[in-house]
Amino acid sequence: MHTHYKDRNSTVIGVIFLILLLQAVIIVSLNVKIGRSVHHAGEVKQQEKQLNRTIISDLHTFPVPAAFRSEITYEDSYGAGRIQGSHEGCDLLDTQNTEGRIPVVSATDGEVTNIGWLYLGGYRIGITAPSGVYYYYAHLSSYAGGMEVGKKVQAGEWIGFMGSTGEGEEGTKGKFPVHLHFGIYYQDGTDEKAVDPYPYLLKIEE
């Protein structure tokens, strides 16, 4: 009788011990995961700060000359819904909606790494700054002379005129108001990611 009682006690104690051990393992595992998450969040925050500093350092000039600044409007439309995905830039609109009227200049020093027609972007130029960040100018009506892949450009250099090209085969225009679509992209490993240009445009204008 007493032996069975002791056996039952031993079994209960063993089960309790296993439960406590399992709880301890779960708590340690959760703490490790939380620690990793906090560390990862800290790394991401640091990377964002570094990217912000890089872009601020890259941008020297507003992409529209000062003489035409009062003749454009823009707002933060980054992330707005589009037919294909979301808007990955900021649109600077010509208040007179006239094709080829307002010149577009490079906001950074850099090298032309893309030029030509895109179905959605129309006539566009992509300029990669020395930092590696990519600056994208789309819907141009035409290019400045000598613009080609490999050309070195300086901030403030004329690269083309604002237009309404795109959303069709080469030469398509007029499907939307005349504007410059200005985009900023950076490499995150093998992925190219967009950045909201709006706050940087505001900062350039300060």
Where in the sequence are the language-model features?
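Acidic, glycine-rich catalytic/binding loops that coordinate metals and/or anionic ligands
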Residues: 60, 148-149, 154, 161, ...
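Surface-exposed, glycine-biased beta-strand/turn segments
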Residues: 27-123, 155, 168, 205-206
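N-terminal Sec-pathway targeting helices
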Residues: 2-23
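Short hydrophobic beta/alpha edge segments that flank linear recognition/processing sites
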Residues: 124-127, 154-170
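A generic structural motif
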Residues: 119, 141, 165, 197-201
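Small beta-barrel nucleic-acid-binding modules, principally OB-folds
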Residues: 84-97, 126-133, 185-195
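Zn2+-dependent peptidoglycan hydrolase active-site motif and core
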Residues: 106-148, 173, 177-178
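Short, charged helix-to-loop "capping" segments that act as catalytic/coupling loops
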Residues: 94-106, 141-150, 164-178, 186-192
